[in-house]
């Protein structure tokens, strides 16, 4: 039947997701709290913390310090909708995960995917850099829903 063949193809797609990515087969909203951070490193600025010397400026994402050239991985499957230089963010890649959810990856050394490309959970999409004026190599990482910034640590697990 058509329903069982659709179910089989959905199961095949889910089985192609790396086992280390438990949220791979889930819709983005259902994967909340189950996705890994896109890079291993030390969180140097958290969502909502003061940015620079101005108390009015707050971080709308995370800044994760990591070695130059470290691979940055997609936290969930999606389509690349932006992959270019953006003032203040350096080399920035944005993934659209559907239903208004975006993940943003900035200050990269290199971008490994182009606009229009579909990526799988865990796929390497960029490498850590300090483009856009950072003093040390770090990844800017943010999640947005319909334009609203969300706390990435509510969506991603800190790896042990």
Walk through the language-model features, giving the residues of each.
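A generic structural motif
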Residues: 59, 67-69, 90, 100, ...
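Short histidine-centered loop motifs in beta-beta connectors
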Residues: 83, 98-118, 122
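Extracytoplasmic/periplasmic cell wall- or extracellular glycan-interacting regions that localize
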Residues: 1-89, 94, 144, 149-160
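Conserved, short, structured surface segments that act as functional micro-motifs
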Residues: 93, 115-160
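Short beta-alpha junctions and helix-cap segments that line functional grooves
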Residues: 28-30, 107-108, 129, 138-139
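Conserved positions in beta-strands of structured domains
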Residues: 44, 79-81, 109, 126-129
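Detector for Asparagine
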Residues: 11-13, 99, 108, 130
């Amino acid at each position: 039947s058509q329903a069982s063949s659709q179910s089989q193809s959905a199961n095949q797609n889910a089985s192609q997701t790396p086992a280390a990515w438990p949220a791979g087969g889930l819709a983005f909203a259902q994967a909340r709290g189950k996705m890994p951070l896109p890079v291993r490193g030390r969180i140097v600025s958290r969502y909502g913390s003061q940015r620079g010397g101005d108390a009015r400026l707050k971080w709308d994402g995370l800044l994760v310090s990591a070695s130059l050239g470290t691979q940055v991985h997609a936290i969930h499957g999606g389509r690349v909708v932006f992959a270019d230089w953006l003032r203040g963010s350096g080399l920035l890649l944005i993934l659209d995960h559907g239903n208004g959810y975006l993940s943003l990856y900035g200050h990269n050394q290199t971008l490994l995917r182009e606009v229009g490309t579909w990526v799988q959970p865990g796929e390497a999409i960029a490498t850590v850099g300090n483009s856009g004026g950072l003093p040390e190599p770090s990844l800017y990482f943010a999640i947005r829903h319909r334009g609203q910034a969300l706390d990435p640590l509510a969506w991603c697990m800190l790896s042990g």
